[in-house]
Amino acid sequence: MPGVGPRSAERIALWIVRVQSDQPDQIARAINDTRQAIHPCELCGFFTTGEICEICADSSRSAELLCVVEQPTDILPLEKTSAFRGRYHSLGGRISPLDHVGPEDLRIKELLERLDREKISEIIFALPSDVEGEATTNYLVDLLKEKPVTMTRIARGLPAGGGLESADELTLYQALSGRTKL
C-alpha cells in the first residue's frame, strides 16, 4: 500500500491479530465495498459510483476546455485549486517504451472520440515534465495537429515559497523561458 512501509505494515498486522473487536472485518468490508462501488467515469476516467462522474455531469463547467492528465489522481490537485472549470481526460498512463507502454495502451482512442463528439476548442496538457510525459505530449500534439483545436500546456516553474537554491536546472529553465510581463 502506498505510504505504508515495512514497520507500519508490521504494526498494522500485529494490531489486526491482537484486536478484540470486529474493526479489522469492518475495514476489510469497507475496502471491498469501495472497490466494488467505485469505477472509472465512462467519459474522463475519473472515479465515480455512476456511469459519469460529477465533474463530467456538471453543466456549469465549460465543455469547450479539456485538460488532459496522466492518471485520474492528477485531477484531484487541479480541482483543489478551483482554477480550472473545464472538463478532464485521463490517459491512464504515459508513453514509456522501457516499460512497454505504447500509445495503444492509453486512452487515446477515447480522447479522439471525444474530440469528434464534443465541441472542444482547447486542450490543456497537464502531463509530467519528465521524458515520458514530454513524449506523450509530443505524440498527442502531432496526432491532433489537424484538429480544429487550440493546444496548450500548463505553465511550469518554481513552486510557491520555493527558493532558487532548491530548484533543479530544468525547473529554472522553464521558469525563465515561461516568464510573464508585469
Residue ranges and their predicted role:
Residues 40, 52, 74, 91-94, ...:
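Glycine-rich, flexible loop/turn motifs
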Residues 10-75:
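Cys/His-rich Zn2+-binding cysteine-cluster or related metal-binding knuckle/ribbon modules and their
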Residues 2, 21, 34, 46, ...:
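Conserved phosphate/pyrophosphate-binding and hydrolysis machinery centered on Walker-type P-loop NTPases
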Residues 8, 20, 85, 112-182:
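Long C-terminal interaction/binding lobes of large macromolecular proteins
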Residues 53, 78, 135-136:
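Short glycine-/acidic-enriched loop or helix-start segments at secondary-structure transitions
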Residues 9, 58-127:
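Extended interfacial segments that mediate partner engagement and assembly in macromolecular machines
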